[in-house]
Amino acid sequence: MKKVLFAIIFILFSSANVNAGCGDPLTEGVDYSNCRFSDAQDLQGSYLPNSNLSFSSFIQVNFDKSIMMNSNLSFGTFPESTFVRANLYESVSIGANFEKTNFTGSNLTRVDFMGATYQIQIYHFQVLFK
């Protein structure tokens, strides 16, 4: 009987899905779909490859220098967020809201932005010569 109980416990813990509650810390390969995160969070340098962030809300969130390769950001809300120098290689962002979002220096290679909304930010730089 003890062996059967041990086997059941072992199977439950070894085959645990990588699911997280919305309050759990962000990490690799986790399903955070449909979560609403606090506005204006500093998540700079987050490690989120292969994560599911679909239908999640990240308003004015700092994702600068984050690694989000192969993640699903579809139908997420990311207005006024920053992804400066973030790695979004092969991420899926179908139908996501990126209005006033800053992607300066980000790796957007093979990202699927089909149906995503965005507003282009034009930055003006003043160069002074002496």
Where are these regions (language model features)?
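Tandem repeat scaffolds
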Residues: A20-K130
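Sec-dependent N-terminal signal peptides
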Residues: V4-A16
